[in-house]
C-alpha cells in the first residue's frame, strides 16, 4: 500500500528536517520511501514543503497530485495544499498559526496547537518535532519509536534531548 504525505510551512520552521526524520523513520521500519524537497530562494520566511511517498513495494513516483496526509504549520501552507488532499484524506494543521476553518467536507481535519506546545517545552524550534508526534498519533503508519530513532540519526544530541 502506498501512502503520500506533504509537509509544509515557512522557511525556518524545520519542515525539511521533519520530512527527513519521517522518511528516515520509514526506512528504519524497512519500508520503501522517497522524499522530495521544494523551497524558494529565500533562506527564511518563504514557503517550504516536502513530499514523501512510502510503500511496502517499490515507489513509482515521488510527486503525486493528491495526498493522503498534509501536515501544515502555517496559514499559507494550509491554503495552498488543502486542495491536494484527496477525498478521505487528512489535513493536520498547527492551530497556533492556522485558522480552524473546514472548507471541504470530504476530508478529515486535525487542528493541534503545535506552536504553543513547543513553547511550553521551552522553544518554538521544536514545533516541527511536535508536529511529527501529532502526525504519528493521527495516521498510525509510523511508530513513535522509529520517529525517535530517525530524529537521533539526523539531529545533534543537544537538539534531540530538547525535542524529546
Q: Model features per residue range: what roles?
A:
Residues 159-164:
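A short, hydrophobic C-terminal helix/tail in secreted or cell-surface proteins
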Amino acid at each position: 500500500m502506498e501512502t503520500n504525505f506533504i509537509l509544509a510551512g515557512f522557511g525556518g520552521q524545520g519542515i525539511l528536517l521533519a520530512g527527513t526524520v519521517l522518511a528516515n523513520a520509514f526506512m528504519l521500519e524497512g519500508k520503501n520511501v522517497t522524499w522530495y524537497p521544494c523551497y524558494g530562494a529565500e533562506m527564511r520566511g518563504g514557503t517550504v514543503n516536502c513530499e514523501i511517498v512510502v510503500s511496502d513495494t517499490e515507489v513509482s513516483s515521488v510527486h503525486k497530485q493528491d495526498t493522503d496526509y498534509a501536515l501544515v504549520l502555517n496559514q499559507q501552507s494550509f491554503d495552498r495544499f488543502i486542495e491536494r488532499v484527496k477525498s478521505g484524506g487528512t489535513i493536520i494543521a498547527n492551530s497556533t498559526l492556522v485558522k480552524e476553518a473546514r472548507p471541504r467536507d470530504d476530508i478529515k481535519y486535525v487542528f493541534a496547537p503545535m506552536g504553543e506546545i513547543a513553547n511550553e517545552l521551552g522553544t518554538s524550534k521544536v514545533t516541527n518535532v511536535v508536529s511529527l508526534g501529532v502526525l504519528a498519533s493521527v495516521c498510525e503508519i509510523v511508530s513513535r519509536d522509529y520517529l525517535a530513532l530517525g530524529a537521533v540519526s539526523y539531529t545533534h544530541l543537544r537538539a534531540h534531548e530538547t525535542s524529546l
